Amino acid sequence: MKLGVISQNLEQFEFEEGLRYARDLGIQAVEVGACGLWGRGYCNPEMLLANRGEIDRWLDTFASYDLEISALGGHGAPLMPNKTVAEEYSREFRLTCEFMELAGLRRITLLAGLPEGAEGDTAPNWVTFAEWPFLRDTLEWQWEKRLLPYWREHGKIAADHGVTLCFEMHGGDMIHNPVTLKQLHDEIGPVAACNFDISHMWYQGIDPIEALYYLGPLVQHVHAKDILISRHNARVRGMMDSTSTEQFADRSWTYTLAGWGHDEATWREFVSTLRLLGYDHVISLEMESEYFEVEEGLEKSVSFLKPLMIEKPSGAKWWEIAGMDRAGGLTQE
C-alpha cells in the first residue's frame, strides 16, 4: 500500500511546487483532478489531448518526484436535471477517458450522480425514506430511467478506453451504500467498482469493516478522512443532518482528519482488513475539515496514517524464514 493525497489539497501550490511539497511530506501518490468539480491545475485533459506530445512530459513530471498517479478524479453532477451542467460533465468525462487511455491510467474516482424525481422536475431528489409507495415509485423511476441508462452508456465509453469507474458511496447520491454500489455493478458490469471512503460509512451508520467484506474485490481505490461526531447535536438532530458544513459547530458531525474522530485501533483494523482482502493500492488522503488549515491538516494526517500503512508485500512467512516445519511433524504419511 502507498499513501496518497488528492490534488485538490495541493491547488494552493503551482504544479511542480505542489508535487515537491507532497513528496517531502512523505506522500507517494496523487489522485489528480481532471473533470467535474475538481480543479484543473494539475491535469487538463482537453489541453493535453490538443498537444499529445505533452502527455509523456506530464507523466514524467510526476515520476521525477517519485510520485505515482493513483487515479484521476472526476466527481461531478452527471445526472443533474440542468441539461447544460449534465452535458458538460458528459463531454468532460469522454475527454478524460480518452486521455486516460493514452496516458496509461486505469482508475477514475467519481460520483454516480443524483437526478430529478420525475420527468420535468428541475431539482435533484434524494430518496432515503421508502415507507410511502410514491417514494418507492420515485426511486424506481430514478434507477430505471436515469441512473442505469446513463451509466450503461458511459460505462461502455470507459470500458472501451480501459478505464474502471471507482464510484464513491456518498450521501446525496444514488450510490450511497454498499448495497446500491453492488446493485449498479451487477447491472452495468465489471467496469463499475468502488472508491471506498470510510467517512461516508460512519455518518450513515454503516459498519465499514462489514462494508469492505461485502464489497471485496470491488474496492479499487480508497479515500482516508474521518468524521467528528458532536454528541449533543446528534442527540437532537440525528445523523442525517442538513445543517451547512460551514456551520460545523452546530452540526451532528463534521469531516475531520484521520484519527481525530476514531481512534488508532479503528484505523489499524481498517488498513489490516484492506490487506486481508487483497487491496494493495493507494490510500488517498482528503483534507476536508472545516476547522483546520489545509497544510496543517495534511501534515497531521500524514503523521497519523504513515506509520499504519502496510507498505511491503507479505513475502515469505515468518516460520519459513525460521526454517520451521509448520506441520510440527504431525502430518500422516
Task: Label each residue range with its predicted role.
Residues 2, 29-30, 72, 140-260, ...:
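Acidic/histidine-rich catalytic cores of soluble enzymes
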Residues 5, 22, 30, 62, ...:
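Conserved, mostly hydrophobic/aromatic
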Residues 11-22, 58, 87-98, 204-213, ...:
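Short, acidic/polar
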Residues 33-58, 112-119:
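Glycine-rich, proline-tolerant flexible connector loops at the mouths of alpha/beta enzymes
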Residues 16-38, 103-107:
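Catalytic domains of carbohydrate-active enzymes, especially glycoside hydrolases
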Residues 10, 284-294, 322:
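A short, acidic, flexible beta-alpha connecting loop/helix-capping segment that sits on the rim
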